[in-house]
Amino acid sequence: MASLDGKVALITGAASGIGKAIAELYAKNGAAVAIADINQQAADAAAAEIKAAGGKAIGIEMDVTSEDAVNAGTDKAVAAFGSLDILISNAGVQIINPIDEFAFADWKKMLAIHLDGGFLTTKAALKHMYKDNRGGTVIYMGSVHSHEASKLKSAYVTAKHGLLGLARTLAKEGAAHNVRSHVICPGFVRTPLVEKQIPEQAKELGISEADVIKNVMLKDTVDGVFTTVEDIAETALYLAAFPSAALTGQSFVVSHGWYMQ
């Protein structure tokens, strides 16, 4: 059984969805978890649930697009738990539109949250992971769209592709300091982020919501089944607990066969 006893994890976007599932599983397996989210109240609530179940957790308000906020939040996690061993860069949003109608402000917002956020949290975490070559694991939440493309998602696809480059560069640079990195690439997971997309895509594509699910989101899976937050959390646990750098700089697609590499 994987164990994270004595480890400290900082997880962004962890008040709900995939991030919360990872935080809960990490805590069950011995890690102290810092729940970082732009919504302080929601972060505190998620941390309280973990503590009520016997785990160690703290809620931290963090806007991943602000370097000052990221640095302050990361330092707060280290002050609370003494170290930082795992970073999960998970915060994200979705905005869809055709390229010719995509507002530049929305484009910049998407890249700021997904890609700048990944960079800023990594930079802040490395200050602690590089110290005395302590090491650590950085996991970026990518997507099948780190490898594929879909209509209406130019900014999202661009940002998720960018995380592959960041992770691979970190794998090479971080090796000297015992830092590993990966990208988890889920298929569609029925989180609030995806629930929001269903009516949006139905309207934009002129089809029913049922058709969006069956013929857009799950069309290329082998079984027509959504990936779950538990699937992603188990993958994140496996990668964080893996005992060596035999796995680093890799992309792990968890998508019911939607994308096979």
Predicted regions and their residues:
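Active-site helix of classical SDR
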Residues: 122, 159, 167
